[in-house]
């Protein structure tokens, strides 16, 4: 149970309970969401939209020699969070074997956060200001593609250096069938300890307001509700890599936007799991069209990145592909870029779009889930995990409130020992409360998006592994 930066950010957002407050997901970008920084909204397919810092502030775009509003700074607010998990279970769910598995984990933070903001009355100073005659090149791209731009008007920054710490440990008592399977005796286990420094000034959460640019002047709307486009009146140049606006609206409705009042029994019929299933299958069916060599490079490269559980590398690769910049990267990300430069795959299949789709799903997950996915591939758990996640999503997807459900015992039977602990931890990280000895749980609306992204990631990796059945990832030290 790793306590990552993005998880801490989401937790702080929950505790602040601020309307329209969004968490910063990546520590490497934590200084790029400060006041006046400009963000480009980019769709993550069905999962959600992402705000990408463009590297400029609003002040960089306006004509010089103008007054700048003074930000309001709040007093630091302390946030302390400690979370621990202690799971223990027998391995005889289906009387396959006798033994035991235990998982112990803890993680948390002690952090001080303060808000810097520019309220709407103070923003009046910047309204209808003239832009520079020569604007940065990214503005031309955004105008042509009708990308919406936003400006950060409130940021919650860490007021002093702090540290995220944690430990996770799996202990496995193996007997009978599992003793033969794992070829170990008695107890075995794996333990990981970590610490993540968060420097002063890192932004954990922010609020944004939309920019509207017309007649070489800039207007800041009171909110980010997208009532207008940033570049109104500009014709849209369709991009093959993006879903249509209507389809994207439906997809976004799957998560939050179209939730009906609590008086309804369920959401509209078109907002069900079949829509997500169709989207994922449309992507995974294209993977077998790639050559075996390309598929193996993609699978092995992603496994290397997932083992590290470092979303910064995945995030950097995703941003490069979204901006169509095949620059230099070291490590496994560089191998994927090399394949994209070769452009030797099936001309009917866009390799960049497929890789981008998986990256967008993975970025919804936590750092510890990334590592758990790699171990799931290694233990060949994916088919069972896809079936289990499907059984949870399919009946509950359309319900916009918490309802109890029961995990089917026959779906747990193949997931024994460490495999069961890994799978349950994946589900817990999505926001579901799971107990190894109890198949009952409760559907939580907030788990809908991460659980859907987990379904997409598992399905994608399963298809790659199926096509590379002879591919055997090397076992990492300390891994059973």
From Swiss-Prot:
* Keyword Manganese attached: no
Task: Tell me which Gene Ontology terms the entry assigns under biological process.
Answer: programmed cell death
Q: Which UniProt keywords apply?
A: Cell membrane, Cytoplasm, Lipoprotein, Membrane, Necrosis, Palmitate, Transmembrane, Transmembrane beta strand
- State one Pfam family annotation: Gasdermin
Q: What is this protein called?
A: Gasdermin-C3
Show the segment(s) annotated as Triggers pyroptosis: 1-226
Which InterPro entries does the record associate with it?
Gasdermin, Gasdermin_pore, Gasdermin_PUB
One Gene Ontology cellular component annotation?
A: plasma membrane
Source taxonomy? Eukaryota, Metazoa, Chordata, Craniata, Vertebrata
Superkingdom field: Eukaryota
- Domain comment (free text): Intramolecular interactions between N- and C-terminal domains are important for autoinhibition in the absence of activation signal. The intrinsic pyroptosis-inducing activity is carried by the N-terminal domain.
Changes after translation: Cleavage by CASP8 relieves autoinhibition by releasing the N-terminal moiety (Gasdermin-C3, N-terminal) that initiates pyroptosis.
Q: What protein family is recorded?
A: Belongs to the gasdermin family.
């Amino acid at each position: 149970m790793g306590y990552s930066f993005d998880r801490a950010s989401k937790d702080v957002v929950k505790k602040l309970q601020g309307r329209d407050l969004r968490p910063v997901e990546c520590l490497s970008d934590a200084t790029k969401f400060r006041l006046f920084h400009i963000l480009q909204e980019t769709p993550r397919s069905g999962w959600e939209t992402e705000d990408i810092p463009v590297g400029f502030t609003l002040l960089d775009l306006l004509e010089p020699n103008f007054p700048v509003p003074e930000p309001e700074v709040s007093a630091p607010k302390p946030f302390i969070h400690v979370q621990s998990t202690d799971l223990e279970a027998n391995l005889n769910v289906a009387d396959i074997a006798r033994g035991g598995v235990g998982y112990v984990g803890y993680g948390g933070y002690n952090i001080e956060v303060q808000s810097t903001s520019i309220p709407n009355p103070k923003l009046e100073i910047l309204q209808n200001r003239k832009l520079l005659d020569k604007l940065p090149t990214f503005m031309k791209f955004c105008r042509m593609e009708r990308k919406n731009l936003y400006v950060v008007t409130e940021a919650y920054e860490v007021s002093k250096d702090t540290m995220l710490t944690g430990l996770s440990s799996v202990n496995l008592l193996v007997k009978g069938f599992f003793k033969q399977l794992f070829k170990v005796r008695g107890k075995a286990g794996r333990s990981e300890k970590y610490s993540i420094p968060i420097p002063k000034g890192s932004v954990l959460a922010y609020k944004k307001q939309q920019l509207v640019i017309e007649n070489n002047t800039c207007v800041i709307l009171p909110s980010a509700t997208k009532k207008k486009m940033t570049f109104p009146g500009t014709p849209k140049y369709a991009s093959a890599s993006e879903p249509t606006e209507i389809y994207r609206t439906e997809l976004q409705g799957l998560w939050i936007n179209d939730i009906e009042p609590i008086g309804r029994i369920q959401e509209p019929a078109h907002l069900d799991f079949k829509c997500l299933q169709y989207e994922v299958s449309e992507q995974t069916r294209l993977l077998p069209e790639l050559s075996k060599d390309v598929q193996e490079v993609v699978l092995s490269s992603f496994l290397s990145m997932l083992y590290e559980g470092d979303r910064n590398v995945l995030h950097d690769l995703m941003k490069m592909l979204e901006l169509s910049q095949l620059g230099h990267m070291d490590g496994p990300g560089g191998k994927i870029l090399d394949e994209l430069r070769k452009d030797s795959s099936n001309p009917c299949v866009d390799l960049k779009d497929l890789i981008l789709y998986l990256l967008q799903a993975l970025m919804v997950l936590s750092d510890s889930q990334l590592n758990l996915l790699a171990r799931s591939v290694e233990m060949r758990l994916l088919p069972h995990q896809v079936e289990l996640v499907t059984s949870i999503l399919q009946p509950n997807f359309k319900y916009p409130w918490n309802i109890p459900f029961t995990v089917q015992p026959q779906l747990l039977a193949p997931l024994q020992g460490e495999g069961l602990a890994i799978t349950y931890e994946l589900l817990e990280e999505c926001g579901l409360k799971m107990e190894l000895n109890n198949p009952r749980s409760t559907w939580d609306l907030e788990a809908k998006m991460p659980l859907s992204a987990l379904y997409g990631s598992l399905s994608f990796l399963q298809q790659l592994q199926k096509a590379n059945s002879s591919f055997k990832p090397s076992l990492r030290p300390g891994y059973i």
